[in-house]
Amino acid sequence: SQNFHVDGEDPLLLKVFIYFTDVKDGDGPFTYVKKSHKAIRQTYFILRYGVASIPESRLSNKTKLNIIQGIESSGTIFFADTNGLHRGAKISQESKGRILMMLSFVSKWPIRSSKNEESLLPFTSAKDLMAKNF
């Protein structure tokens, strides 16, 4: 997704990215909001079920984001906790694109179950979440 989002498969999710081509700014580099995984864990379920993605315009006006971009050469391997805000940045028309492999590592059983997720929600709506965090 080209909007910032979190992956909802598992709160213990870890992804590995391997670039097979050089990735420059216009090639759609992986982009991550540094330390966002800590804030997101507190609001995991509301983001998972209430907000599919967050446009950058919604974030940048209210938050000074500490963004890390994966602008790297072919052969680069990096790890990301994609429970934090991340995206694949927009690809420019001049770009030849990028080729990468992504591996996902998840727990055997998520630490939270659907039976108790309502009691873990610190916010009552996506609107409440956005107002208090962004």
Predicted segments with their positions:
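Histidine-centered catalytic micro-motifs
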Residues: 2-8, 85-88
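Short helix-to-loop capping/linker segments positioned immediately adjacent to catalytic or ligand/cofactor-binding
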Residues: 3-4, 18-20, 64-68
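Residues in well-ordered beta-strands of folded domains
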Residues: 5, 17, 31-33, 102-104
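Alpha-helical and His/Cys-centered functional microenvironments
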Residues: 9, 38, 90
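Short, conserved beta-strand element in jelly-roll/cupin
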Residues: 9-25, 71-74, 79, 104-108
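Double-stranded beta-helix
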Residues: 25-85, 110
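Non-heme Fe(II)/2-oxoglutarate
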Residues: 77-79, 83-134
